Amino acid sequence: MSIKVEWIKFTRLKKCATLLVQLSLLRYRYMVLAYNHKFDCIVVTIYCGCLFWFSNGALFTEGKARDRGRWAKATMKKNYGVKLKIFLFTILLAFETNTFTPYTSTFSHFARGCL
C-alpha cells in the first residue's frame, strides 16, 4: 500500500515537472520572439505550474475518500485550502503583473486558457 502511494506520488511529480518544463520552454520562446519580455514569461510559467500542481494534489493517493480513511480525508481538506490560497495568490499576481507590464492581454489570455 505504501509503495503504491509513493509510486503514484513519483509519477505525478514527474508529470508535473515535464509539463512545467514544456510550458516554460514554449512560453519563453513565444515571449522572446514576440516581446522580448522575460519577466512576464517567468511569472506565467510559475503560475501555470502551481495551478497544475495543486489542482492535481488530491490525486496523489488513489481510490475514493471513504476507502482511504482518515489520513486521506485530512489531506483532501488540506489540498482544498492550498488550492484556495494558490487561487488568491494568482489573482493578486495577475493584478500585479497587469499593473507593471504593458502586455496585459497576453497574460490574461494565457491565464484564462489554463483555468
Curated annotation (Swiss-Prot):
Keywords recorded for this protein, A-Z: Membrane, Signal, Transmembrane, Transmembrane helix
Function: Has a role in meiosis.
Disulfide bond residue pairs: none
Protein name, as recorded: Meiotically up-regulated gene 106 protein
Compartments (UniProt record): Membrane
UniProt topology in membrane: Multi-pass membrane protein
Signal peptide: 1-34
Transmembrane segments: 41-60, 81-103
Superkingdom to which the source organism belongs: Eukaryota
GO cellular component: membrane
